[in-house]
């Protein structure tokens, strides 16, 4: 998904501050916001079968060997997801029902400033491009911009009861500024709940500068094996895609090819008529 827009100076909404991260799930005795099902995480808590909220929705904080922070969410129902505060609150490794779904790069660590996008790109379920640039380097802006390589501040997380399920919210701010120019803040909230494979990313871009500025954003979603396998086909209601470079003979930008040494990337732009796309022929239906 991608989009380009603008924001006027001094405008933008801010999210509601979260309660204390260690606060229990709030629910009056015997009440739910929607009918409960027998297998939901909330029902397990209500019946006393699980004594603590982190028994159905846990969040573990850790640091990797390079010092970067990771919030690992494990949710009743099968979703396991890493949130990366030091990479713009993007999404790292992800599993559903024990099956890895995110593509991850073979790089062991980010080598740091001075290297290009491809050397620093670690993959993960989501890498956000922008808000200063998307695509090839342009002017002083490097390939795909700075969001994915910028640390989030004021990061916090909390749990909320949602009917018979429990949702984990992670929130933080990612700043993009120059000394005498642009001052943008991307306020991001990630929501993932028990009982569903969905994860929601809510972004609000605020312009704290003194002039209107364009804000290109591209959400670089990376799905990989074993969920995605050679032969998988993208189904999208769209005109024929525009490709950056002509693909090799017999290769379609809509079909994942077999692995081949030295194969070049095929970059295609799809302009769907509806905001829905499907993958068929994957390793798991």
Describe the residue ranges of each PLM region.
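Compositionally biased, low-complexity flexible segments
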Residues: 7-14
């Amino acid at each position: 998904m991608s989009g380009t827009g603008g924001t006027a100076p001094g405008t933008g909404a801010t999210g509601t501050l979260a309660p204390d991260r260690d606060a229990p799930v709030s629910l009056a005795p015997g009440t739910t916001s929607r009918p409960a099902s027998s297998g939901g995480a909330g029902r397990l808590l209500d019946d006393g079968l699980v004594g603590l909220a982190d028994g159905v929705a846990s969040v573990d904080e850790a640091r990797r060997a390079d010092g970067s922070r990771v919030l690992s969410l494990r949710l009743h129902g099968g979703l396991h997801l890493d949130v990366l505060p030091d990479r713009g609150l993007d999404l790292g490794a992800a599993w559903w029902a024990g099956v890895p779904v995110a593509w991850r790069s073979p790089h062991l660590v980010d080598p740091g400033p001075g290297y290009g996008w491809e050397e620093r790109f670690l993959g993960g379920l989501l890498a956000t491009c922008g808000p200063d640039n998307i695509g090839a380097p342009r002017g002083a802006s490097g390939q795909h911009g700075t969001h994915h390589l910028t640390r989030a501040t004021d990061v916090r997380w909390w749990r909320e009861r949602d009917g018979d399920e429990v949702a984990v919210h992670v929130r933080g701010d990612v700043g993009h500024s120059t000394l005498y120019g642009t001052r943008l803040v991307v306020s991001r909230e990630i929501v993932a709940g028990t009982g569903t494979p969905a994860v929601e990313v809510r972004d609000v871009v605020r312009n704290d500068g003194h002039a209107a500025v364009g804000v290109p954003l591209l959400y670089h979603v990376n799905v990989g094996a074993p969920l995605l396998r050679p032969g998988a086909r993208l189904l999208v209601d769209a005109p024929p895609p525009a490709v950056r470079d002509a693909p090799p003979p017999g290769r379609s930008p809509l079909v994942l090819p077999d692995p081949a040494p030295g194969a070049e990337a095929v970059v295609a732009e799809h302009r769907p008529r509806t905001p829905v796309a499907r993958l068929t022929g994957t390793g798991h239906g």
